[in-house]
A protein has these predicted regions:
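Conserved N-terminal segment of class I S-adenosyl-L-methionine
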Residues: 1-123, 127, 140, 156, ...
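Short conserved AdoMet
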Residues: 76, 134, 148
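Residue-level detector of anion-binding/catalytic polar loops
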Residues: 102, 152, 196
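A short, conserved alpha-helix within the catalytic core of class I
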Residues: 133-143, 157
């Protein structure tokens, strides 16, 4: 077994909950669910369809602004961005477009057009998406490939730290959440790809491609 985040082999059992095994990578400190317990693609998609993310809902926009506000300060006016894993209600795309940015969007279930792979972007957002990655190493490499040098990747996910009771953690209980990251994980990801890394607030990380 190798870590799906960094491909390291220094893995140990972290916890066993409801007959599901969770492992921790001692290299990058990611925690991940045994792939034997992953949902089928159909079951996963059905869960996502249940999400009610109205792109004009002010509460949802307020939630997304936790990433929007810090990354928009890094950007030149009108540059092109990509929302990676935008889900069925791409509100963040709408927020950037309203501010004058040119946006593409990608989601493997709802917006599966992969033409973005032939382009490059000044910024990429990945909001409440990385915890769903079955193959995060490959996903982050794909993102890195289409991110311009000097460009920004903004990511939002719940960070794990050892003060959290993992068994009772609501974020773990979502059956579509299969990978959990700590601050240490993100610093490791950055060092492996020659990105700089800053954490402007809780559960938000900004990477710059050097």
């Amino acid at each position: 077994m190798t870590c799906p985040v960094c491909k390291g082999s220094n893995i140990e059992l972290f916890d066993q909950i409801d007959q599901k095994n969770y492992f921790e990578c001692n290299t990058c400190k990611a925690i991940f669910l045994d792939r034997k317990s992953h949902l089928t693609l159909q079951d996963e998609q059905e869960r996502y369809i249940q999400h009610n993310n109205d792109i004009y809902d002010p509460e949802y926009r307020r939630f997304l602004s936790r990433l929007y506000n810090p990354i928009v300060k890094k950007l030149s006016a009108g540059v092109m961005g990509l929302d990676y894993g935008c889900g069925p209600g791409p509100a963040l795309v709408q927020m950037f477009r309203e501010a004058g940015f040119v946006m593409d969007l990608y989601d493997p279930y709802f917006f599966p057009d992969t033409s973005f792979l032939s382009k490059t972007y000044k910024f990429i957002t990945c909001t409440e998406t990385a915890e769903h990655f079955y193959k995060p190493f490959e996903e982050f490499n794909k993102i890195n490939k289409v991110l311009d040098r000097g460009g920004w990747l903004g990511l939002m996910t719940k960070f794990f730290d050892k003060s959290i009771n993992f068994k009772d953690w609501y974020y773990r209980k979502d059956p579509t959440h299969v990978c959990f990251y700590s601050e240490e994980t993100f610093h490791f990801l950055a060092s492996e790809r020659n990105w700089s890394c800053e954490i402007p607030s809780k559960d938000i990380v900004l990477f710059k491609k050097n």
